[in-house]
C-alpha cells in the first residue's frame, strides 16, 4: 500500500505572530485576544467572535478581508478558503510551500483558537431534526484538523480551559510556544473532533433507527482521573458520554472523598435498581455491594424503606452503597449514618440531611437531580479482547408484561405484588439470580452462582441469618414469593425454593422441562407465573 511520506522538521519554539480566533463558546476569548494584542499579534476573526473582539476596542481583521470572499449562506461558508487553510497547513521550512504562499498571497497563521457549534447540547436538549443538522459545524472541525496536523508550526486551542496555560507559555518564552505544548494541544484537538463526529454519527443512527451501524464510535469526556481501578495496580479514569440520564455521571458530590472506580460502578447499579420503583407510589431503598443488592425494600416512609432494606442482610450492607428514590430527609440520614456506608445517592438532599451526613466527612453524598427512567433503553457497552459488545439497556418492565399463570392455583393479590417486586430486583442481580420477597421487601438474595439451585439455597441461607439477627422465629422466606431471572431448567430449583417456604414463583419460562417444573409446583400447591422475558445479567 502506497503511503504519503514527508519529513517535517519540528522547531521547539514558535513565535505567535498571527492568530485566527473563531469560537462559538466565547468564554475568555476577549481576555485572550487582549493578551495577544498586547504582544503585537495580528488578530484574524469571523462572525460573532470578530464582533466581540472589536467591541472590546481591539484591532482585529475580518477573515473575509484576507480571503477577498464574503461570508455567505448564513455563515455556512466563511473559512473554507485556501487563504485560511494554506496559512494553517503550510510547512514553514519547505521552500515549495513558501513559494506557494508568496504566489497566492497567503499569510502564515501561528495560532488557531477554535471551538464548535453546540451540536451535542442541541442533541441532548432534544432539538428537532432540522435544528440539530444546522448545528453540525463544518468549517470549525476543518480548521482544527488542519492546525493540529501542522502542530510543528501551529498552536491549536479548542478548550477555554487551556487559555491560561497558553498565556503562561507566552509570558515565559517571549511570545513563543514549545513543541511539547503544541503536540499536546494537537492530540486534544483530534480527540475533540473525533468525539464531535462520533456524536453526529450516533445521532444519525438513532434518528434513522439504525441499530447496528457499520462503524460504532463511543466517545466520552474525561470527568476525573482516579487513583486506581478495580484494584490498586490498575489505572483508571471516568469518562462521561453526555447522555442526560440522571445518575452517577450527572450527580453532584455534596461531600466526601473522590468516588473510586468501584464506588462509581456500584453506585450506578444501585441507582438504576432503585429507579425501578416509582417515587410517587412509595419510598424505596436499595443497598448494594459489588454491584449486587444486599437488600431492597419499599416502605410507608423513606426511613422505613431503608430499615427494611437493611434488615435483609445487615452484615453485607456494611461499607455498601445506599440508593434512594426520594429526597433524603433528616430522619433517614440520621439512621443511615449509624452504619459505615461508602456512598449515598438520592434525587436530592435536604439541608438538614446534609448537616447530619456532614458528621461523617468520608461518607460520599450524591445528589443526582432526578431518577433515570427505567423504560428508556439507551446503550450499554462492554469490552472484550479486540472488540466491543454493544446492546440496548435492559428496559423490560414486569408491569408491561402479560403474565401467564401456568399452575392450577393462581397467585393471590399479595403474592402477585411480591412476585413483581422480586422480579424487578432480580433484573439487577448477577446471574444466576434468585430473589425471595415478601410485603415489598427482599427476604433473601442469591447472586452470581453457576447453579440456580445454589443461588436459591444461598438466598434461603441469607434469609435464615437475617431472621436470627432480627430475633424472628422463622425466616421471611416463609410465605414469600420468589423470582428467578431466567427459566428454571429442572424441578430441583423449584423444590429448593419450596423448601425455603416460598408459596409463589415468577420466572420467564421457556425450558424444555417447563412441564416437569409446573407439575412439581402443582404437586406442592404452589402458584407460578411465566413472564416470557429473561433478565440475564453478567
Swiss-Prot record:
This protein's domain notes: The IMP cyclohydrolase activity resides in the N-terminal region.
Molecular function (Gene Ontology), one example: IMP cyclohydrolase activity
Source organism: Rhizobium etli (strain ATCC 51251 / DSM 11541 / JCM 21823 / NBRC 15573 / CFN 42)
InterPro entries listed in its UniProt record: AICAR_Tfase_dup_dom_sf (IPR024051), Cytidine_deaminase-like (IPR016193), MGS-like_dom (IPR011607), MGS-like_dom_sf (IPR036914), PurH-like (IPR002695)
Annotated GO CC locations: cytosol
Protein name: Bifunctional purine biosynthesis protein PurH
Reaction equations catalysed: (6R)-10-formyltetrahydrofolate + 5-amino-1-(5-phospho-beta-D-ribosyl)imidazole-4-carboxamide = 5-formamido-1-(5-phospho-D-ribosyl)imidazole-4-carboxamide + (6S)-5,6,7,8-tetrahydrofolate; IMP + H2O = 5-formamido-1-(5-phospho-D-ribosyl)imidazole-4-carboxamide
CDD domains found in the cross-reference section: IMPCH
Amino acid at each position: 500500500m502506497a503511503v504519503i511520506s514527508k519529513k517535517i522538521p519540528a522547531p521547539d519554539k514558535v513565535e505567535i505572530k498571527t492568530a485566527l480566533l473563531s469560537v462559538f463558546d466565547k468564554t475568555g476569548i476577549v481576555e485572550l485576544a487582549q493578551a495577544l494584542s498586547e504582544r503585537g499579534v495580528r488578530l484574524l476573526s469571523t462572525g460573532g467572535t470578530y464582533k466581540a473582539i472589536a467591541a472590546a476596542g481591539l484591532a482585529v481583521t475580518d477573515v473575509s478581508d484576507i480571503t477577498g470572499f464574503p461570508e455567505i449562506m448564513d455563515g455556512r461558508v466563511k473559512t473554507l478558503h485556501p487563504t485560511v487553510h494554506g496559512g494553517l497547513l503550510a510547512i514553514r521550512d519547505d521552500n515549495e510551500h513558501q513559494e506557494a504562499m508568496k504566489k497566492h498571497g497567503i499569510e502564515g497563521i501561528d495560532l488557531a483558537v477554535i471551538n464548535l457549534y453546540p451540536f451535542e447540547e442541541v442533541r441532548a436538549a432534544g432539538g428537532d431534526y432540522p435544528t440539530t443538522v444546522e448545528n453540525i459545524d463544518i468549517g470549525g472541525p476543518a480548521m482544527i484538523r488542519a492546525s493540529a496536523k501542522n502542530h510543528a508550526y501551529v498552536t491549536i486551542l479548542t478548550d477555554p480551559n487551556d487559555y491560561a496555560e497558553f498565556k503562561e507559555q507566552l509570558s515565559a518564552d517571549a511570545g513563543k510556544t514549545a513543541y511539547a505544548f503544541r503536540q499536546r494541544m494537537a492530540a486534544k484537538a483530534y480527540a475533540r473532533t473525533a468525539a464531535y463526529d462520533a456524536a453526529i454519527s450516533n445521532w444519525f443512527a438513532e434518528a434513522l433507527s439504525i441499530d447496528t451501524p457499520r462503524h460504532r464510535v463511543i466517545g466520552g469526556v474525561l470527568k476525573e482521573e482516579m487513583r486506581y481501578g478495580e484494584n490498586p495496580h490498575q489505572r483508571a479514569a471516568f469518562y462521561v458520554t453526555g447522555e442526560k440520564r440522571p445518575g452517577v455521571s450527572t450527580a453532584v458530590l455534596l461531600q466526601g472523598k473522590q468516588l473510586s472506580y468501584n464506588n462509581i460502578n456500584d453506585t450506578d447499579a444501585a441507582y438504576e435498581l432503585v429507579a425501578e420503583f416509582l417515587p410517587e407510589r412509595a419510598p424505596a431503598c436499595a443497598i448494594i455491594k459489588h454491584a449486587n443488592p444486599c437488600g431492597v425494600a419499599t416502605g410507608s416512609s423513606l426511613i422505613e424503606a431503608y430499615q427494611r432494606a437493611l434488615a435483609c442482610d445487615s452484615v453485607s450492607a456494611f461499607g455498601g452503597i445506599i440508593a434512594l428514590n426520594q429526597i433524603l430527609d433528616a430522619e433517614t440520614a440520621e439512621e443511615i449514618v449509624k452504619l459505615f456506608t461508602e456512598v449515598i445517592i438520592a434525587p436530592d438532599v435536604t439541608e438538614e440531611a446534609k448537616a447530619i451526613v456532614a458528621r461523617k466527612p468520608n461518607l460520599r453524598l450524591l445528589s443526582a437531580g432526578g431518577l433515570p427512567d427505567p423504560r428508556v433503553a439507551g446503550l450499554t457497552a462492554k469490552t472484550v479482547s479486540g472488540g466491543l459488545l454493544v446492546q440496548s439497556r435492559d428496559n423490560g418492565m414486569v408491569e408491561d408484561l402479560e403474565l401467564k399463570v401456568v399452575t392450577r392455583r393462581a397467585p393471590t393479590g399479595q403474592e402477585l405484588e411480591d412476585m413483581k417486586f422480586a422480579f424487578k430486583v432480580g433484573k439487577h442481580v448477577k446471574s444466576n439470580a434468585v430473589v425471595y420477597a415478601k410485603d415489598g421487601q427482599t427476604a433473601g438474595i442469591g447472586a452470581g452462582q453457576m447453579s440456580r439451585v445454589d443461588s436459591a439455597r444461598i438466598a434461603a441461607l441469607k434469609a435464615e441469618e437475617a431472621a436470627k439477627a432480627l430475633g424472628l422465629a422463622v425466616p421471611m422466606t416463609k410465605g414469600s414469593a420468589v423470582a428467578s431471572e431466567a427459566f428454571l431448567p429442572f424441578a430441583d430449583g423449584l423444590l429448593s425454593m419450596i423448601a425455603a417456604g416460598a408459596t409463589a414463583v415468577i420466572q420467564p419460562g421457556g425450558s424444555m422441562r417447563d412441564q416437569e417444573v409446573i407439575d412439581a409446583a402443582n404437586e406442592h400447591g404452589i402458584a407460578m407465573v411465566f413472564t416470557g422475558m429473561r433478565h440475564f445479567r453478567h
